[in-house]
């Protein structure tokens, strides 16, 4: 249902830089309101506001840019918290479940394109999840794109890295 800005604000539907949308198995709608509000918002399948969670920060349940998300068959919500270099997993009511990290070594000849990246000191990077999708297979797998070092990660839902494709560079 389309709402006026005043109605939307009162019902949790006032966004500032939303970055992604996903649905759970029950049809509930999740929106990552990332660039300014640093929160997740949940609506029922009719667009009625149910709840929101999160705030700006780096603690569990906080976000520094919830940029991408997916919902698995069990209704768990995977939020790519890009600027905190992690994926946070929540139940469908916003209860924190676990953190997934893509902490794999960079190639020895890798040159980070930005300053301040950990790779220069440790050989491991601060990966940043940019986009995610889930397979339809059983068990489901999570595929995550990462801007630096330019990889696509294949992950089990418990966070185990199953492999990756690509490397940073230009065509």
What are these regions (language model features)?
Residues 1-171:
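Eukaryotic scaffold repeat domains enriched in small/polar residues
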């Amino acid at each position: 249902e389309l709402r006026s800005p005043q109605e939307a604000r009162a019902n949790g539907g006032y966004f500032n830089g939303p970055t992604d949308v996903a649905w759970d198995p029950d049809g509930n709608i999740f929106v990552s309101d990332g660039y300014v509000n640093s929160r997740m918002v949940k609506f029922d399948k009719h667009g009625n506001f149910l709840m929101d969670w999160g705030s700006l920060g780096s603690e569990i349940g906080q976000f520094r840019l919830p940029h991408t998300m997916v919902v698995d068959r069990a209704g768990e919500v995977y939020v790519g918290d890009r600027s905190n270099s992690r994926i946070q997993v929540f139940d469908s009511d916003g209860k924190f479940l676990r953190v997934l990290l893509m902490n794999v070594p960079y190639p020895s000849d890798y040159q980070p394109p930005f300053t301040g990246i950990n790779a220069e000191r440790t050989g491991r990077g601060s990966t940043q999840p940019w986009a995610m999708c889930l397979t339809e297979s059983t068990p489901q797998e999570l595929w995550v794109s990462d801007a630096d070092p330019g990889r696509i990660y294949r992950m089990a839902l418990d966070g185990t890295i199953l492999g990756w494709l690509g490397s940073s560079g230009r065509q």
